[in-house]
Amino acid sequence: MLSRSERILENIPVGSLGIIPLLGCEELGNKVNGYLVKWRRESAHEHKNDVAFSGYEKENYLINASVPRFGSGEAKGILGESVRGKDIYLMVDVCNYNVTYSLTGNTNHMSPDDHFQNLKRIIAAVGGKGRRINVIMPFLYESRQHKRTSRESLDCALALQELVRMGVDNIITFDAHDPRVSNAIPLSGFETISPTYQFIKGLLRKVKDLQIDSEHMMAISPDEGGTNRAVYLANVLGLDMGMFYKRRDYTQIVNGRNPIVAHEFLGSSVEGKDVIIIDDMISSGDSIIEVATELKRRKAKRIFAAATFGLFTNGMEKFDKAYEGGIIDGILTTNLIYQTPNLLSKPYYINCDMSKYIALIIDTLNHDGSLSEILSPNERIQNVLQKYKNGETI
């Protein structure tokens, strides 16, 4: 993949760029805006004074928008400036439970449903006046409800169709739980992006004595659903791959699902090897810790868990104990969703910043450029591996 400085974006932009980070996504939005302002100022675009490039180089691409609430808890979307003719990018973090609002005098934490409703409110406030509407939703809303088992709703498919009906042209997400959910909107733009490169770079920056070959390292999938991620990581790093599958008790239902009896391992020996467990999300963390415990029992050397989304729904205590007990040596997640100050303070936590990558995607899409080279990180991964092996700064 080419970096921003190497990309030649001469196409006329679809429209003047506008970014709307919704409530709870402001920090990521500000970082993305900072990169875009810097790049466009440095590029000294030869056509920037052309009328077709009007508004190309600005001090700020953020659009003022808000979602105030009435005392009853109802809300409305408001735009503080005109968006007519703009190429609009809406950024939403549906997992940010730290945002609150007042409901009849009580403090309510925002759920994914609330965030999705806010997204629709701002799209409605645009009122069809924008040139194009793009939604950047790192954690795809309802992505875990992607298929029907018995009498269930297909929430993710319904949400995608609703956005398309409202005029959304492109939906950009990261590590969708099942990318096939795009079948719900086959004629619209849908991209699911993997942060594998950012994980590798984050790990190499933090751990200086890794031996990256099949004799000393393995990539592990904690379940059968995530094997594609582990296979890709193993291929680009030249490692062996292993996986666990969940043995469930189908005679019982606990908390809406069949309880896991055991995690069974399939793969070659992990003895003496560093292990990377890769998954799309860490929810409660029970599965990751059980898998790591089993790998330690099999005499794995160091264990690093990488997941695009760190939800940590039951807190960090079990991870603290796993770290202190030598079961887990590091946890990598991205800043695509809300991160608590407690998480960021942990000695074993490695934060992978995705803001530069998102800025590159927005910059390319605004020029109607191809995303193919951006979405394939093979070349960048090999470059960073070579730097690591040569002892250069990453």
Locations of regions flagged by a protein language model:
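PRPP-associated nucleotide enzymes
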Residues: 1-394
